[in-house]
Amino acid sequence: MVTTAEKTNIGYITQIIGPVVDVKFPGGKLPQIYNALKIVGTNESGQEINITVEVQQLLGDNQVRTVAMSSTEGLVRGFEVTDTGAPITVPVGKATLGRIFNVLGEPVDNRGPVNAEASLPIHRSAPKFTDLETKPSVFETGIKVVDLLTPYRRGGKIGLFGGAGVGKTVIMMELINNIATQHGGVSVFAGVGERTREGNDLYNEMIESGVINNENLNESKIALVYGQMNEPPGARMRVGLSGLTVAEYFRDVNKQDVLLFIDNIFRFVQAGSEVSALLGRMPSAVGYQPTLGTDVGELQERITSTTEGSITSIQAVYVPADDLTDPAPATTFAHLDGTTVLSRGLAAKGIYPAVDPLGSTSTMLQPNIVGDEHYNTARAVQSTLQRYKELQDIIAILGLDELSEEDRLIVARARKVERFLSQPFFVAEVFTGSPGKYVKLEDTIKGFQKILSGELDALPEQAFYLVGDINEAIAKAEKIKG
């Protein structure tokens, strides 16, 4: 770690504007950009102060401008500030599994201190170009619509795009559950500016499902790093980096395949824009920070696969007002290998997961990667749904009877396909009352082939709603007829 001074370097606060704190240091003893500074003491009203701030700008006149990682309430001008001589560091390694940390790597789950084998700074360089792994392989999730139409890349970056309340967090929780039970790898979850209640629910569900082993934390499969909605923007801006640092250690030192979940990448951008104006930067398009591309790039370029191990990242991206051209989601798009777009229209129909089969994409859906059978089935599903979409206006105006025999058949099959793309989730059992289902890729492909070939034309469409594989749909149809 880089130190900026041989002995303790002490300055004092000259100005406080919300989460932004200006600090003056003695001549020639300025801390470096991104160094962590500590403010510890008691103010005049007897309030204990223990705040970490991060250097963002060198202002001249021996002053630095910093952003606080916790509330600046109770701070006053003249308070002493100590330069730690290094960036914020967080504990890493096996000891982090089953624990919840804040942005500074402090445990917040009332389980005592963490005996970590190492601590690493949250600001690090991306892996060298020559160290990157480029062989594409598919990552099975057990979710039909994802595996068929937007297959995820092992070591890739996937975005879950959707407006408020369409199910981003639920899909993410299902993926964590499926991966922990089916693949057995380690995961890191970074909660960036989302609801504290959701963070708490996620933690409790993981204990229930055994992903976090309460009796023996070392056997847990996930480490959690939270910087929730009520935290100041500094914490929300950096908590993604703290989570990523934990994941990088598992990849680089333990040589493991890691899953990194970030919920929500938009809040990371939003925190940056909150801080940006206070740092005196001119806002850019729609009020975002002018450094939007750089901020997102610094985070995304570190999430990658090397020859030692991989980080597969699944990132929820809130889409403001359902507008995918907003600068925040649009900038994120450029970094992703796959996009899973959630549709409010499908959610309104009660089709969950509400993944838009025509709007979602994946660089993996190529015959030389997934094979001809998978590719042709996926494309046939999409063209059937596309034709159904084109016919909907005619149906709305003239009714089904005015369609040709062939088109009526396409509509009937498309409605079955649409319903078969829904699936009961393990993490949603409490709400739906249906047990969750993990569907293997070959069963998914077989099921859709049977629907499209006309083999199941006689079955009612409701038999395909919220089931696992095609055999369940056939059994459900028997039940309905019976």
Curated annotation (Swiss-Prot):
Pfam families to which the protein is assigned, alphabetical: ATP-synt_ab, ATP-synt_ab_N, ATP-synt_VA_C
GO CC terms of this entry: plasma membrane-derived thylakoid membrane; proton-transporting ATP synthase complex
Binding positions (ATP): G162, G163, A164, G165, V166, G167, K168, T169
Subcellular location: Cellular thylakoid membrane
Gene3D superfamilies: 2.40.10.170, Bovine Mitochondrial F1-atpase, Atp Synthase Beta Chain, Chain D, domain 3, P-loop containing nucleotide triphosphate hydrolases
Known catalytic reactions: ATP + H2O + 4 H(+)(in) = ADP + phosphate + 5 H(+)(out)
Membrane protein topology class: Peripheral membrane protein
InterPro entries: AAA+_ATPase (IPR003593), ATP-synt_VA_C (IPR055190), ATP_synth_F1_bsu (IPR005722), ATPase_a/bsu_AS (IPR020003), ATPase_alpha/beta_chains (IPR050053), ATPase_F1/V1/A1_a/bsu_N (IPR004100), ATPase_F1/V1/A1_a/bsu_N_sf (IPR036121), ATPase_F1/V1/A1_a/bsu_nucl-bd (IPR000194)
GO molecular function annotation: ATP binding; ATP hydrolysis activity; proton-transporting ATP synthase activity, rotational mechanism
PROSITE patterns: ATPASE_ALPHA_BETA (PS00152)
EC number of this enzyme: 7.1.2.2
UniProtKB keywords: ATP synthesis, ATP-binding, CF(1), Hydrogen ion transport, Ion transport, Membrane, Nucleotide-binding, Thylakoid, Translocase, Transport
CDD domains: ATP-synt_F1_beta_C, ATP-synt_F1_beta_N, F1-ATPase_beta_CD
Family to which the UniProt record says this protein belongs: Belongs to the ATPase alpha/beta chains family.
Record's function text: Produces ATP from ADP in the presence of a proton gradient across the membrane. The catalytic sites are hosted primarily by the beta subunits.
Subunit note: F-type ATPases have 2 components, CF(1) - the catalytic core - and CF(0) - the membrane proton channel. CF(1) has five subunits: alpha(3), beta(3), gamma(1), delta(1), epsilon(1). CF(0) has four main subunits: a(1), b(1), b'(1) and c(9-12).
Protein name listed in UniProt: ATP synthase subunit beta
